[in-house]
């Protein structure tokens, strides 16, 4: 699978995917990344890709022209085009699964400043996606998160296939069961005896009974 990133900061993207499991997966040919510097398509000597807003307003918008040219440079390899934007649909595990199943390349357009000329969303992208109801400093962070969530679903990325099935968010409104490692007791805090028993049926039953429900009231702790 291939991930394209149209960005002002290619080094941020490259840095994230140059270590850990991501690096190993790329070296193994499980997926590949391609970063496109948006400024290369600015069309002006100052390499500016943003401009003021028609009708007035604070800040600057990314222009449609350089984004269009960057997409054209990818040809048929652009696949599904995703604009990361605060106004996009909230990304979740179900979307990650669907994107992986398509097998198509994914091309991410990262938003910056006040956002992107609306004609990009209207004419050039397949999906607008957000990480949630909050604003981050650059769309690159969202692009990386989405690509990471999809890439780790690819065959061979993780050693154990079962680990994908047991993860949080594969079950609606339910999180992963509690997990423990050595020592079996620390500071008076003990690992449940059933997990030390070696009885796989009992362990499985305990895990199912102790899957954590999503608690909507956690904000009260703040």
Curated annotation (Swiss-Prot):
Chief place where the protein resides: cytoplasm
Location in the cell: Cytoplasm
Swiss-Prot/TrEMBL keywords: Cytoplasm, Methyltransferase, S-adenosyl-L-methionine, Transferase, tRNA processing
Documented EC number(s): 2.1.1.228
Keyword Methyltransferase set for record: yes
Gene3D superfamilies recorded: 3.40.1280.10, tRNA(m1g37)methyltransferase, domain 2
A cellular component term, taken from the record's GO annotations: cytosol
Positions that bind S-adenosyl-L-methionine: 111, 131-136
Recorded catalytic activity of this chain's protein: guanosine(37) in tRNA + S-adenosyl-L-methionine = N(1)-methylguanosine(37) in tRNA + S-adenosyl-L-homocysteine + H(+)
Pfam entry (one): tRNA_m1G_MT
GO MF terms held by the record: tRNA (guanine(37)-N1)-methyltransferase activity
Gene Ontology terms describing biological process: tRNA N1-guanine methylation
Keyword set includes S-adenosyl-L-methionine: yes
EC supergroup of this enzyme: transferase
InterPro entries, alphabetized: Alpha/beta_knot_MTases, tRNA_m1G_MeTrfase_C_sf, tRNA_m1G_MeTrfase_TrmD, tRNA_m1G_MTases_N, tRNA_MeTrfase_TRMD/TRM10
Purpose: Specifically methylates guanosine-37 in various tRNAs.
Binding partners and assembly: Homodimer.
Record-stated family: Belongs to the RNA methyltransferase TrmD family.
Record's protein name: tRNA (guanine-N(1)-)-methyltransferase
